[in-house]
Curated annotation (Swiss-Prot):
The active site is at H247. Pathway: Carbohydrate metabolism; tricarboxylic acid cycle; succinate from succinyl-CoA (ligase route): step 1/1. Belongs to the succinate/malate CoA ligase alpha subunit family. Substrate binds at Y159. This is Succinate--CoA ligase [ADP-forming] subunit alpha. It comes from Staphylococcus epidermidis (strain ATCC 35984 / DSM 28319 / BCRC 17069 / CCUG 31568 / BM 3577 / RP62A). One of its GO terms (cellular component) is succinate-CoA ligase complex (ADP-forming).
Length: 302
Protein backbone atom coordinates (compact mmCIF):
# COMPACT_ATOMS: atom_id res chain seq x y z
CA UNK A 1 0.00 0.00 0.00
CA UNK A 2 0.92 3.65 -0.37
CA UNK A 3 -0.88 6.95 -0.56
CA UNK A 4 -2.03 8.87 -3.66
CA UNK A 5 0.05 7.02 -6.30
CA UNK A 6 1.35 3.50 -7.00
CA UNK A 7 2.75 1.36 -9.81
CA UNK A 8 -0.63 1.38 -11.60
CA UNK A 9 -0.88 5.19 -11.78
CA UNK A 10 -1.03 6.42 -15.38
CA UNK A 11 0.61 9.82 -15.73
CA UNK A 12 0.42 12.63 -18.27
CA UNK A 13 2.96 15.46 -18.39
CA UNK A 14 1.54 18.93 -19.06
CA UNK A 15 4.10 21.09 -20.85
CA UNK A 16 6.08 17.99 -21.88
CA UNK A 17 7.94 19.66 -24.77
CA UNK A 18 9.69 22.21 -22.53
CA UNK A 19 13.32 21.51 -21.62
CA UNK A 20 12.68 21.03 -17.87
CA UNK A 21 9.74 18.72 -18.50
CA UNK A 22 11.70 16.68 -21.06
CA UNK A 23 14.58 16.16 -18.63
CA UNK A 24 12.30 15.06 -15.80
CA UNK A 25 10.08 12.94 -18.07
CA UNK A 26 13.15 10.87 -18.90
CA UNK A 27 14.05 10.59 -15.20
CA UNK A 28 10.51 9.50 -14.31
CA UNK A 29 10.43 6.92 -17.11
CA UNK A 30 13.81 5.56 -15.98
CA UNK A 31 12.36 5.15 -12.47
CA UNK A 32 9.54 3.02 -13.88
CA UNK A 33 6.69 5.54 -13.78
CA UNK A 34 3.97 4.83 -16.34
CA UNK A 35 4.01 8.05 -18.38
CA UNK A 36 1.39 7.48 -21.05
CA UNK A 37 0.87 10.97 -22.50
CA UNK A 38 2.16 14.50 -22.80
CA UNK A 39 0.18 17.69 -23.43
CA UNK A 40 1.39 20.80 -25.24
CA UNK A 41 -1.19 22.83 -27.21
CA UNK A 42 -0.21 22.96 -30.89
CA UNK A 43 2.28 20.09 -30.61
CA UNK A 44 -0.25 17.22 -30.80
CA UNK A 45 0.97 14.27 -32.88
CA UNK A 46 4.61 14.56 -31.83
CA UNK A 47 6.34 11.82 -29.83
CA UNK A 48 8.96 12.73 -27.20
CA UNK A 49 10.94 10.17 -25.18
CA UNK A 50 8.55 7.59 -26.66
CA UNK A 51 5.54 9.43 -25.18
CA UNK A 52 2.72 10.62 -27.50
CA UNK A 53 1.88 14.34 -27.27
CA UNK A 54 -1.70 15.67 -27.39
CA UNK A 55 -3.14 19.16 -27.73
CA UNK A 56 -5.49 18.92 -24.73
CA UNK A 57 -5.74 17.10 -21.41
CA UNK A 58 -9.19 15.79 -22.36
CA UNK A 59 -7.84 14.19 -25.52
CA UNK A 60 -4.83 12.72 -23.69
CA UNK A 61 -7.07 11.21 -21.01
CA UNK A 62 -9.53 9.73 -23.52
CA UNK A 63 -6.76 8.22 -25.66
CA UNK A 64 -4.54 6.82 -22.89
CA UNK A 65 -6.60 6.48 -19.69
CA UNK A 66 -4.20 8.75 -17.76
CA UNK A 67 -5.56 9.55 -14.28
CA UNK A 68 -2.85 11.85 -12.84
CA UNK A 69 -1.07 14.81 -14.41
CA UNK A 70 2.14 16.60 -13.54
CA UNK A 71 2.44 20.27 -14.49
CA UNK A 72 5.74 21.74 -15.74
CA UNK A 73 4.02 24.66 -17.46
CA UNK A 74 5.57 28.16 -17.01
CA UNK A 75 4.06 30.24 -14.20
CA UNK A 76 1.89 32.61 -16.30
CA UNK A 77 -0.01 29.65 -17.80
CA UNK A 78 0.18 27.07 -14.98
CA UNK A 79 -3.13 27.97 -13.31
CA UNK A 80 -4.99 27.39 -16.59
CA UNK A 81 -3.26 24.02 -16.92
CA UNK A 82 -4.45 22.96 -13.45
CA UNK A 83 -8.01 24.06 -14.28
CA UNK A 84 -7.88 22.14 -17.58
CA UNK A 85 -6.84 18.98 -15.70
CA UNK A 86 -9.69 19.46 -13.21
CA UNK A 87 -12.15 19.93 -16.09
CA UNK A 88 -11.01 16.56 -17.44
CA UNK A 89 -11.82 14.99 -14.04
CA UNK A 90 -8.33 13.64 -13.38
CA UNK A 91 -7.81 12.10 -9.92
CA UNK A 92 -4.81 14.27 -9.13
CA UNK A 93 -2.72 17.15 -10.48
CA UNK A 94 0.82 17.60 -9.17
CA UNK A 95 2.07 21.11 -9.94
CA UNK A 96 5.84 21.60 -9.86
CA UNK A 97 5.84 25.19 -11.19
CA UNK A 98 7.11 27.98 -8.93
CA UNK A 99 6.20 31.71 -9.03
CA UNK A 100 2.50 31.26 -9.87
CA UNK A 101 0.79 34.51 -8.78
CA UNK A 102 -1.10 34.10 -5.49
CA UNK A 103 -4.26 35.55 -7.04
CA UNK A 104 -4.14 32.81 -9.73
CA UNK A 105 -3.91 30.14 -7.03
CA UNK A 106 -6.83 31.63 -5.10
CA UNK A 107 -8.93 31.27 -8.27
CA UNK A 108 -7.70 27.70 -8.82
CA UNK A 109 -8.46 26.73 -5.23
CA UNK A 110 -11.98 28.12 -5.56
CA UNK A 111 -12.44 26.31 -8.88
CA UNK A 112 -11.41 22.96 -7.38
CA UNK A 113 -13.98 23.14 -4.56
CA UNK A 114 -16.53 20.36 -4.94
CA UNK A 115 -14.54 18.64 -7.70
CA UNK A 116 -12.87 15.25 -7.40
CA UNK A 117 -9.42 16.41 -8.58
CA UNK A 118 -6.79 16.67 -5.83
CA UNK A 119 -4.09 19.30 -6.36
CA UNK A 120 -0.63 18.74 -4.85
CA UNK A 121 1.54 21.88 -4.94
CA UNK A 122 2.28 24.22 -6.57
CA UNK A 123 5.98 24.92 -6.07
CA UNK A 124 6.59 21.38 -4.85
CA UNK A 125 8.99 18.52 -5.67
CA UNK A 126 6.11 16.12 -6.34
CA UNK A 127 5.05 12.75 -4.94
CA UNK A 128 6.96 9.47 -4.92
CA UNK A 129 5.96 6.00 -3.82
CA UNK A 130 9.29 4.24 -3.34
CA UNK A 131 10.27 1.66 -5.98
CA UNK A 132 6.91 2.10 -7.75
CA UNK A 133 6.12 5.55 -9.08
CA UNK A 134 7.94 8.90 -9.09
CA UNK A 135 6.06 12.01 -10.22
CA UNK A 136 8.09 15.20 -9.96
CA UNK A 137 11.70 16.31 -9.65
CA UNK A 138 13.04 14.42 -6.62
CA UNK A 139 16.12 12.17 -6.94
CA UNK A 140 14.66 8.68 -7.22
CA UNK A 141 17.65 6.67 -6.04
CA UNK A 142 17.49 7.81 -2.39
CA UNK A 143 13.96 6.45 -1.90
CA UNK A 144 13.58 2.81 -0.82
CA UNK A 145 10.42 0.89 0.00
CA UNK A 146 9.44 0.69 3.65
CA UNK A 147 7.04 1.94 6.33
CA UNK A 148 7.70 5.66 6.92
CA UNK A 149 5.58 8.36 5.30
CA UNK A 150 7.14 11.76 4.63
CA UNK A 151 5.23 15.04 4.16
CA UNK A 152 7.01 18.34 3.66
CA UNK A 153 6.75 21.98 2.61
CA UNK A 154 10.39 21.88 1.46
CA UNK A 155 11.82 19.89 -1.43
CA UNK A 156 15.48 19.70 -0.43
CA UNK A 157 14.69 18.99 3.22
CA UNK A 158 12.53 16.08 2.02
CA UNK A 159 15.53 14.64 0.18
CA UNK A 160 17.70 15.19 3.26
CA UNK A 161 15.24 13.35 5.53
CA UNK A 162 14.69 10.49 3.08
CA UNK A 163 18.42 10.04 2.50
CA UNK A 164 19.04 9.85 6.25
CA UNK A 165 16.29 7.26 6.69
CA UNK A 166 17.59 5.15 3.80
CA UNK A 167 21.15 5.31 5.18
CA UNK A 168 19.78 4.02 8.52
CA UNK A 169 18.07 1.09 6.77
CA UNK A 170 14.59 2.61 7.11
CA UNK A 171 12.48 2.61 3.94
CA UNK A 172 9.52 4.81 3.04
CA UNK A 173 5.98 4.32 1.79
CA UNK A 174 5.29 7.63 0.05
CA UNK A 175 6.94 11.06 0.23
CA UNK A 176 4.63 13.99 -0.51
CA UNK A 177 5.92 17.51 -1.15
CA UNK A 178 3.00 19.86 -0.48
CA UNK A 179 4.90 22.93 -1.69
CA UNK A 180 6.12 26.21 -0.28
CA UNK A 181 3.50 28.65 -1.55
CA UNK A 182 0.97 30.37 0.72
CA UNK A 183 -1.99 28.95 -1.23
CA UNK A 184 -1.70 25.26 -2.06
CA UNK A 185 -3.96 22.35 -2.90
CA UNK A 186 -3.11 19.64 -0.37
CA UNK A 187 -2.14 20.46 3.21
CA UNK A 188 -0.39 18.60 6.02
CA UNK A 189 -3.65 17.30 7.49
CA UNK A 190 -4.79 15.82 4.14
CA UNK A 191 -1.56 13.83 3.89
CA UNK A 192 -1.42 12.87 7.59
CA UNK A 193 -4.97 11.54 7.29
CA UNK A 194 -3.94 9.40 4.31
CA UNK A 195 -0.88 8.07 6.17
CA UNK A 196 -2.99 7.36 9.28
CA UNK A 197 -5.36 5.22 7.19
CA UNK A 198 -2.58 3.45 5.26
CA UNK A 199 -1.80 0.04 6.75
CA UNK A 200 1.78 0.04 5.40
CA UNK A 201 2.75 3.38 6.96
CA UNK A 202 3.90 2.85 10.57
CA UNK A 203 5.45 6.29 11.32
CA UNK A 204 5.58 9.74 9.74
CA UNK A 205 8.14 12.51 9.26
CA UNK A 206 6.59 15.98 8.86
CA UNK A 207 8.77 18.88 7.70
CA UNK A 208 7.45 22.41 8.03
CA UNK A 209 8.86 25.90 7.91
CA UNK A 210 8.14 29.43 9.08
CA UNK A 211 5.04 31.26 7.84
CA UNK A 212 1.32 30.56 8.12
CA UNK A 213 -0.36 28.26 10.66
CA UNK A 214 -0.42 24.94 8.78
CA UNK A 215 1.97 23.23 11.20
CA UNK A 216 0.02 24.35 14.28
CA UNK A 217 -3.24 23.06 12.78
CA UNK A 218 -1.55 19.77 11.87
CA UNK A 219 -0.16 19.42 15.41
CA UNK A 220 -3.65 19.75 16.86
CA UNK A 221 -4.98 17.18 14.37
CA UNK A 222 -2.14 14.78 15.23
CA UNK A 223 -2.92 15.07 18.95
CA UNK A 224 -6.61 14.31 18.39
CA UNK A 225 -6.45 11.70 15.62
CA UNK A 226 -3.06 10.19 14.82
CA UNK A 227 -2.39 6.67 16.03
CA UNK A 228 1.18 6.47 14.71
CA UNK A 229 4.36 8.24 15.85
CA UNK A 230 5.07 11.54 14.06
CA UNK A 231 8.35 13.45 14.25
CA UNK A 232 8.90 16.92 12.89
CA UNK A 233 11.39 19.53 11.80
CA UNK A 234 10.71 23.25 11.28
CA UNK A 235 12.96 25.20 8.91
CA UNK A 236 13.74 28.90 9.43
CA UNK A 237 14.62 28.94 13.12
CA UNK A 238 16.98 31.91 12.64
CA UNK A 239 14.76 33.86 10.22
CA UNK A 240 14.12 37.55 10.98
CA UNK A 241 10.47 38.74 10.93
CA UNK A 242 9.18 40.20 7.67
CA UNK A 243 11.83 38.61 5.44
CA UNK A 244 10.82 35.98 2.92
CA UNK A 245 13.09 32.93 3.23
CA UNK A 246 13.17 31.24 -0.17
CA UNK A 247 9.53 30.18 -0.49
CA UNK A 248 6.74 32.69 -1.02
CA UNK A 249 4.94 31.27 2.04
CA UNK A 250 8.00 31.27 4.30
CA UNK A 251 7.58 34.64 5.97
CA UNK A 252 6.86 35.67 9.57
CA UNK A 253 4.19 38.37 9.47
CA UNK A 254 2.17 40.03 12.21
CA UNK A 255 4.19 38.15 14.83
CA UNK A 256 2.70 34.84 13.63
CA UNK A 257 4.36 31.87 11.98
CA UNK A 258 7.65 31.79 13.88
CA UNK A 259 9.64 28.57 14.12
CA UNK A 260 9.66 28.64 17.94
CA UNK A 261 5.85 28.88 18.06
CA UNK A 262 5.50 25.96 15.68
CA UNK A 263 8.04 23.81 17.53
CA UNK A 264 6.37 24.50 20.88
CA UNK A 265 2.93 23.59 19.50
CA UNK A 266 4.25 20.37 17.94
CA UNK A 267 6.01 19.37 21.17
CA UNK A 268 2.91 20.18 23.23
CA UNK A 269 0.90 17.90 20.94
CA UNK A 270 3.29 14.97 21.37
CA UNK A 271 5.38 15.42 18.22
CA UNK A 272 9.13 15.15 18.83
CA UNK A 273 11.11 17.66 16.77
CA UNK A 274 14.67 17.61 15.45
CA UNK A 275 16.77 20.69 16.26
CA UNK A 276 18.71 20.54 12.99
CA UNK A 277 18.07 18.88 9.61
CA UNK A 278 20.87 16.40 10.27
CA UNK A 279 18.97 15.00 13.29
CA UNK A 280 15.69 14.15 11.50
CA UNK A 281 16.67 10.49 11.05
CA UNK A 282 17.84 9.95 14.62
CA UNK A 283 14.74 11.74 15.99
CA UNK A 284 12.55 9.28 14.09
CA UNK A 285 14.60 6.34 15.35
CA UNK A 286 14.16 7.52 18.97
CA UNK A 287 10.40 7.88 18.51
CA UNK A 288 10.17 4.46 16.83
CA UNK A 289 12.07 2.81 19.69
CA UNK A 290 9.73 4.43 22.23
CA UNK A 291 6.73 3.17 20.26
CA UNK A 292 8.26 -0.31 19.99
CA UNK A 293 8.27 -0.35 16.17
CA UNK A 294 11.94 0.28 15.37
CA UNK A 295 12.64 -3.31 14.22
CA UNK A 296 9.61 -3.20 11.91
CA UNK A 297 10.98 -0.09 10.21
CA UNK A 298 14.30 -1.71 9.25
CA UNK A 299 13.33 -2.80 5.74
CA UNK A 300 16.54 -2.10 3.81
CA UNK A 301 19.13 -4.86 3.80
CA UNK A 302 22.59 -3.34 4.18
Amino acid sequence: MSVFIDKNTKVMVQGITGSTALFHTKQMLDYGTQIVAGVTPGKGGQVVEGVPVYNTVEEAKNETGANVSVVYVPAPFAADSIIEAADADLDMVICITEHIPVVDMVKVKRYLQGRKTRLVGPNCPGVITADECKIGIMPGYIHKKGHVGVVSRSGTLTYEAVHQLTEEGIGQTTAVGIGGDPVNGTNFIDVLKAFNEDSETKAVVMIGEIGGTAEEEAAQWIKENMNKPVVGFIGGQTAPPGKRMGHAGAIISGGKGTASEKIKTLNDCGVETADTPSEIGTTLIDAAKKAGIYEELLTIKK
